[in-house]
Amino acid sequence: MDSDLMDFFDFSKQFKRGTALKGCITGDPNALTTESRDSKPIKREKIGTDYVNEIVEKEKQLMNKLVDGQSVAKRNRTLDELDSDDEEENMQEQPSVRSDEAYYEKYRFDLNRNKNLPIYAQREQIMKAIRENPVVILKGETGCGKTTQVPQYILDEACKRREFCNIVVTQPRRIAAISIANRVCQERQWQPGTVCSYQVGLHRQSNVEDTRLLYCTTGVLLNNLIRLKTLTHYTHIVLDEVHERDQDMDFLLIVVRRLLALNSRHVKVILMSATIDTREFSKYFATSSAFPPVVTASHGRKYPLVKYYRDQLKNIHWKDEPQERAPGIGPEGYADAIKILLVIDNMERKAVGQSLQSYEEAKRTGSVLIFLPGINEIDTMADHITSVMEENPTMIITIVRCHSLMSPDSQEEVFQPPLPGHRKIILTTNIAESSITVPDVSYVIDFCLTKVLHTDTATNYSCLRLEWASKVNCRQRAGRVGRLRSGRVYRMVSKAFYLEEMKEFGIPEMLRSPLQNSVLKAKELEMGRPSEILALAMSPPNLSDIQNTVLLLKEVGALYTTVDGVYEELDGDLTYWGTIMSRFPLDVRLSRLIILGYVFNCLEEVIVIAAGMTVRSLYLTGKRRQVNDAFWMHYIFADGSGSDMVAIWRVYRIYLNMCQDRMLKESAEQWARRFNVNLRSLKEMHLMVQELRQRCASVNLQPLPYGTCQMWDDREKSIILKVIIAGAFYPNYFMRSNKSNADYDRSLFQSICGNDPCRTVFFTHYEPRYMGELYTRRIKELFLEVKIPPENMDVTFLHGSEKVFVTFKSDDEDMDTAKVVQVPGRVMTEVYKAVRMRLENQNRPLRVMDQNSALRYVQDRKIGVVTEGTWFPPSNQWNVELLTLPSVFAKNITGLVTYIVSCGKFYFQPRALAESIASMSEIFNGPQQLSCHVRNASAVTKGLQLLAKRGHLFQRAVVLRIETQTNGHPRFRVRFIDYGDMAVLPMDQLRLMPHELKRDFDQLPPRMFECRLALVQPSMVTSSYNRWPKAANDMLISVAQCGRLELEVYSLVNNVAAVLIHMRDGVLNDRLVERQLARRADEDYMSRKDHDLRIRKQEAKRNISVAEQERINEEYLRFAQLPKDMDLEPPPLDKCNLSIRLRGPFSPLESSMNSMLRIGMYKSVTIDKDSVNAVLLDTDPQDRHDQMVVAASVTETDNTERLTARGTTLMPNIHGFGALMAMLFCPTMQIKCNKDRTKYVCLLAGLGFDPETLEPYFAEHDMVINLDVTILRDDIRIINQMRYNIDSMFYNFDANEMPSVGTEDRVVIFNQLRSLLTRLLGKDRSFIERHVSNSEYLWEDMSDLEPPSEPYGKRAIFPMHSSYDLENDNLSNLLELQANCKQLYDWRNFEGNLQTQVCRLCNESLESVAELRLHLLTQLHRDREKQVGYKQQ
């Protein structure tokens, strides 16, 4: 180690960069310091496209047979002769022609076509080429009429000949297929759905038999051809927009070419596009003797278009030459675009005298379209333009943003004419290349950049990369101008770079996107292995990408790991899950979500979630650096679940209810704006939900009929949905970091000086010399932007610290009503809002006075005391001797529970105060004290202390608020100070306190104190939102109704006592655990620290006099009181001559995450900023167990160093939940034991390994989970039973490839799954010490184990897990651990400096006596004591 350190500082030696481990480490990281095979990042070898050559050669031979069966004319010999007219006749037998005379008599056929369309000029040439060639390529510019007219030309010719024809035309988008079909019907005056119709997804117009011209999406035709395995169902197949080269189109080209040569030689194929690469497509469909003919049609431009490149604009002074090799926009790039804007404006001003058009008119039709690669660049460009235009007031502009996430209102702004005298500048992404046409655009500024999504098939991580746009993209962008007048295009690159460096076409989707659906289609095609089919693509993927995709499909259960029982690296037999997945237009993991939803009888919910995950921008996006109030609405929809997917489900349910209530359009739009919902996306999602329901029905996935089994209630559904999500998106698992650090909770409280971390945030960079107590109100006002009222918080300072602490008040006023917004765990909603506020803007300006002025200000107004130049602000003097809080020397207290909110909050009156309370009550109810009736409602204000009727007597109360107005008579909500309960009372049940009474009792602390149950918290299995279940509260109420109770005080923190309630038959806390209404829990650091202090004081009590005990207790209580916010009036702003910047607010609970996958160990992780988990806080800071987050998808940065989790769900804080889910849903796993085989300590999950070499099949996706709770053989048996039942749900998969289990069998299986899952999650698991080793990622040879029974053999998607039997603990080991434990207790009362001790039970080092004492109080150590049989003397 020392030599390594010296080498680091030896600058004569070469410095080597290394990769730091960033993944999920649980336990001692020192165990990983030795380098091993597993400690290095995985780099899988990439295999290119050499495999293609042999397969393509065979396909060419098949294509050459196409010549033998066709009449070939005007064939082109070489690529250079594509336009030649050489003819070659090859007379062969013609196909039989089917007459369709009756059909043409049935419908009206007007054969007069629109001659004004440019395509009409090539009509005869097009038809001649189609008659004489199997494949024709038609290149026609946008707007020439090819999409609507060419199919009609074919239909007209068939009509003339009275021949049968059946034409199908593909469109890449649904809306295009529908609108074009309707347009053709309108043009021909056909009833929609007769001669011409459309099909999108499963939705097809009714009269199928009469349809002769079908417009459909690419996927519809592809699925039909895979099912039919022939083209002969159609006479003509027209593939439109083939240049887009998405995966469906590329795979469709494979299928069409293969079937055309194989069994459909007489079918005609027409390829159409505005920007088609004619050479590539001609080569793809070429035979040995000819190439398909190319017919070109153009429409001619009405107004001229001039293009300029950066190096051609000599009059503009460029500050620097761009680094064109690396795509991107620097500060100078934005400035250069603004220079062009100024040049455009000056040019139009000077042209006024030379043109008939005025300057104002020129601005109206001279809108500027600036193409930028993304939303961040749009915001940056807008900022630059705004700042420059402020210096040029003569140029008045309107900036409009245009991107896919904009609201409908913003979309309308793009098309609206600019205000009089304004020039419209549209900042857009590539959405305006083809989807949007704005007529008044005359100028385009093109940065020639785009963002393209690439997916690493080995990791399944996606990355949005900034790249140079293709020339095709740039030409499409240029085509946006010149609609109303001549146009100009300014490309922000040099002409040489554009011509020589930029690519002609973009990268096809098949080379950069996941291949799962293409591989599944290749399997369904049944014409060879996936690699043999995909090798035939126009741009075949790398073999390693196919291999990785096969591995991913095996992981999700779409493919078996074997082919006919033998492992295949590049192939696997199609499972019934894979067949179902191939029928859904979804990512395979969303399809898996639906399948598991069917298994666990939550089909409707998962269909909605899957539909919502396919729709982009369900929520609207606000502008940068603006706290988007509507963002908080995401949390309302998530309803405390911590799940983006649950939020989607709830949004849809509300929308559906509104639709059923027939809400007016205006009301729906108002609701959508209020809740930040994109109504257009919601409607699109609704259509997808309907389609997915149809697709589920088509593969026999149906919900169980109501009444056939017990349905999930809302509480159960909140857990089962998360179980399904964990199963669907395995292995996108992430674990919160730092929880296992023994020092975690101590540093947590130290950072906020003992405040409650669940209610406290803090600012930094506040210098104490600025006398912060003067500005508490101003600091509170900072939170108004997130709608937190100033009265709901206290602002405090620590002497000498630069931190400002903001503690939010518990919502006592609403504790009997449900909150509008729920957040997970114990943390207050306001903390989430505060942290979200910082994420939008980290620096907060605050106006203050300089120190000398501030000192004069407080002295003049006698605020506090100034001593030797130091200000001491006013403070509350605590009369701690009057507090009713339990003494530090009191262990047990007897008394009454006065009011119960829940097991986590109730109020207790000590028996010792009974006489004084009775005396107070007698005073309050004397005639003289009750004489002050409330005559005027205005006299009752919030916070006023008065007397209010409680039962038959009046008691002290404080006014919370005016509650209701009933018949003009106000009612007031009050809280009884000495009992804790609340009531809503009319004025006649209130009395004002006389002056003398107020003087005597106004400052008297409450005659009760707040309590909560210690060492337990609500069970996540039986409660939601960390609330105590009703059954638990009812148990506490029944105990309290028995009269006097005995409380054992565990600790006192922030004036709240953590207690154990003793009953005749035990302790209530334990009984709640036994009934699964609660679970055992650690107390937090402050509670354990106080408990340790109380134990030591109580042990020493016999040696301390009563008077000394009182003095010590007063000192204890005084020290326990936190600083109070005095809420001083701030100085006037005109006296505040300085501005400082606070940083924050921060929360000590902010968490980071680590990937649990091996491939993600070396990467940092963030959560998508629009997720409900974007503010990820430690919801249960006292709990040291890991809590898991599951992501629907994961993207990575271009440098692959950082991952972003999207569509996240926070899993329930059930101990061991992550390990149990991995065991339940992984393809296979090995659970490993400690060296003595007495307990399971970790599990290795993944796709499995080669039994001969022990090398993993898919090392990147192997996952290690170190166990922190006990997992037993019984748990593995339960999991195996559940895996068997999931497989059984699809047993007897028949020839129709549909699950054929009957309803009765399904009900039996579902009830078994329900029972097993409840058993698995409901166990109270004891804690175990952490284990980490260097061999965790090594698959072990377990051939000595008897293999488990496999009911479905190698046809099981979820094979049975095997595991070693556990041994009993060795007696000598137990004795050693007991001796170690006794030694720790012996050191507990040591007063000197302690040498480092090791707790061998928990594998933790203890550096001090204080640390040792607190460790002995942890749940982990107490559980370990029980496990080793140690009993404290």
UniProtKB/Swiss-Prot annotation:
* Domain Helicase ATP-binding: from-to ranges: 127-294
Compositional bias, Acidic residues, is annotated for 81-91
The positions annotated for binding ATP are: G140, E141, T142, G143, C144, G145, K146, T147
What region holds the Tudor domain? 937-1000
Q: Which GO terms describe its cellular component?
A: nucleus; P granule
Molecular-function annotations in GO: ATP binding; ATP hydrolysis activity; RNA binding; RNA helicase activity
- Record field: catalytic activity: ATP + H2O = ADP + phosphate + H(+)
Keywords, A to Z?
Answer: ATP-binding, Cytoplasm, Developmental protein, Differentiation, Helicase, Hydrolase, Meiosis, Nucleotide-binding, Oogenesis, RNA-mediated gene silencing, Spermatogenesis
Provide an example Pfam family for this protein. Answer: TUDOR
Q: Taking every annotated instance into account, which residue ranges of this chain make up the domain Helicase C-terminal? A: 354-526
Short sequence motif DEAH box: positions: 240-243
Region Disordered, residue ranges: 76-98
Q: Where in the cell is it found?
A: Cytoplasm
- Judging by the UniProt lineage, the source's domain of life is Eukaryota
The EC designation for this entry is: 3.6.4.13
Which Gene Ontology BP annotations are present? Answer: dorsal appendage formation; germarium-derived oocyte fate determination; global gene silencing by mRNA cleavage; heterochromatin formation; intracellular mRNA localization; mitotic chromosome condensation; oocyte karyosome formation; oocyte localization involved in germarium-derived egg chamber formation
- InterPro entries reported in the protein's UniProt record: DEAD/DEAH_box_helicase_dom, Helicase-assoc_dom, Helicase_ATP-bd, Helicase_C-like, P-loop_NTPase, SNase_OB-fold_sf, Tudor, Znf_C2H2_type
Q: Which family does it belong to?
A: Belongs to the DEAD box helicase family. DEAH subfamily.
What is the protein's known function?
Answer: Probable ATP-binding RNA helicase which plays a central role during spermatogenesis and oogenesis by repressing transposable elements and preventing their mobilization, which is essential for the germline integrity. Acts via the piRNA metabolic process, which mediates the repression of transposable elements during meiosis by forming complexes composed of piRNAs and Piwi and govern the methylation and subsequent repression of transposons. Involved in the repression of LTR retrotransposon copia.
PANTHER family hit by this protein: ATP-DEPENDENT RNA HELICASE (PTHR18934), ATP-DEPENDENT RNA HELICASE TDRD9 (PTHR18934:SF113)
Q: What is this protein called?
A: Probable ATP-dependent RNA helicase spindle-E
Organism of origin is Drosophila virilis
- Source lineage: Eukaryota, Metazoa, Ecdysozoa, Arthropoda, Hexapoda
